[in-house]
């Protein structure tokens, strides 16, 4: 269990450094580096997509829920004012185990959604307008499943939903999850990946889908209280910057 304790210590050390005035070695290191006052960071997320095999540190639901519980207990002990979220997804089974174990220590449930699976294909071909409009029907169901799990456990008044990563498009990086890269050399792979930057492919489909997603969040604003478009700049972001200026994409 030494590795387990080490993970917890690493998580809490960041909170010490950020939010404590002068207690402990990490707060003192912050002061020594020129930041006398604490940063008082309010929102902290435990983990990132730890349900996914593409993540280093992926966990099964039972193991993950235990790690979240112990992390949250330690972090709340260090600073009871912080707001904590934990990596989850639109899967009632995963969320149920997480919330049953750690729900009393969490303030948010963190969900990432990308609706056009460009991360899974080699050829860069964003879905057409009709396909994306068909996918708007998945938005309400995505929210209602999570809301239902919270309600079942009596946590709908305590825990809010944070879509702290969402985008109509997945990230186009073919083969990166499997480390295969389709046999491409580095320079070839980068050319394929950089097709994300092709501004002409961002169309009204992106804009309308984005509007539908945000409207559904507003309809459920009693529980959905965070929705962060990811990324904001370049790649699949709504703003593309280059040496000559910037492009505001249709999103």
What are these regions (language model features)?
Residues 1-124, 144:
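N-terminal catalytic cores of secreted or lumenal carbohydrate-active enzymes
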Residues 162-251:
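Aromatic/acidic polysaccharide-binding cleft in carbohydrate-active enzymes
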Residues 117, 121-198:
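A compositional/structural signature marking long, glycine- and acidic/polar-rich segments
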Residues 19, 102, 150, 221, ...:
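Active-site catalytic pocket residues across diverse enzymes, especially alpha/beta-hydrolases
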Residues 43, 118, 133-137, 236-237, ...:
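Solvent-exposed, flexible loop/coil residues
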Residues 27, 55, 130-133, 233-234, ...:
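Generic, ordered loop/turn and secondary-structure boundary motif
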Residues 3-6, 55-66, 97, 130-137, ...:
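Alpha-helix capping and helix-loop boundary segments enriched in small/acidic/polar residues
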Residues 26-35, 68, 72-95, 137-169, ...:
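Aromatic-lined carbohydrate-recognition surfaces of secreted/lumenal glycan-active proteins
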